[in-house]
A protein has these predicted regions:
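Short coil/turn connectors between adjacent alpha-helices in alpha-solenoid helical repeat scaffolds
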Residues: 17-26, 77-89
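Mid-chain, well-packed structural core segment of small domains
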Residues: 61-85
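Structural register within alpha-helical repeat arrays
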Residues: 7, 13-14, 71-78, 92
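Amphipathic alpha-helical binding modules
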Residues: 84-125
């Protein structure tokens, strides 16, 4: 659980940096460290189905869904830095929908993120 808490703090730092205009300078390293901590990367997430991603992220503690939510948020933050953001946003959206269905708790925050992603996808399309 310590890993999940630390990754949550990293994501908060990513959002803070982006909102402060420092995202391009500081966020790539934080995103890379966070993916290494999750023992995954963008390529794996983009090329696998949510079920497979959950299994890979489960680890010894069975917290795959929690890690998947963090991975989805990392994809969103990475999309702000990418010259090709749509695949990242589409996968983040897919993972968040998967979480809404498979997690035991309904999340309003996830629903708001999904709405924001939808708006951004339409804007970029």
């Amino acid at each position: 659980m310590v890993q999940i808490e630390e990754l949550g703090k990293a994501i908060a730092q990513l959002v803070f940096n982006r909102n402060a205009g420092n995202g391009p300078d500081k966020n790539p390293e934080i995103i890379g460290q966070s993916f290494r901590s999750l023992k995954t990367d963008t390529a794996f997430l983009l090329n696998h189905e949510p079920d497979d991603i959950e299994l890979a992220l489960n680890g010894e503690d069975g917290c795959g869904l929690e890690r998947m939510e963090l991975a989805a948020k990392l994809l969103i933050e990475e999309s702000y830095l990418s010259s090709v953001p749509l695949p990242l946003l589409n996968k983040a959206q897919e993972l968040l929908y998967y979480l809404q269905i498979h997690d035991t708790a309904f999340s309003l925050e996830r629903m708001m993120l999904l709405q924001d992603i939808e708006v951004e996808i339409k804007r970029l399309s």
